[in-house]
């Protein structure tokens, strides 16, 4: 589903994070690994504090091996991101995605994990391909 440009972007986030792990607001990662072979990554999520905000974070990437879709790994990753952010006192998580038909399962996933579609920017990526914004409110105690 991801283009080579998208894969390159995701890899650059990893490189940036590990090149300077002491940066003040680093990209953060949650990884799902195989229980028998921890080197085998099943999926991951990348998230971080939205610059110039107080308590808002962005989910940059959440990806699961396509052969494992529907097995609950994405939900576990998403729930762990939400747990970490709540523990940090954050109040909302913002997600951006495409309106293309091949992203329909992704948009349905965000709805299933409690996100709400907040906005659309028409023709953002290209004509007929909107940028869709979802928000997950994070209840903190």
Language-model features and meaning:
Residues 85-99:
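Conserved GNAT acetyl-CoA-binding A-motif
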Residues 63, 99-101:
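Active-site-proximal loop/turn and secondary-structure-junction residues that shape catalytic pockets
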Residues 1-67, 75-80, 84, 88, ...:
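Acetyl-CoA-dependent GNAT
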Residues 72:
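Conserved G/P- and acidic residue-centered "switch" motifs that form tight phosphate/ATP-binding loops
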Residues 106:
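Helix-turn-helix
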Residues 96-99, 111, 115-132:
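Conserved catalytic-core motifs of GNAT/GCN5-like acyltransferases
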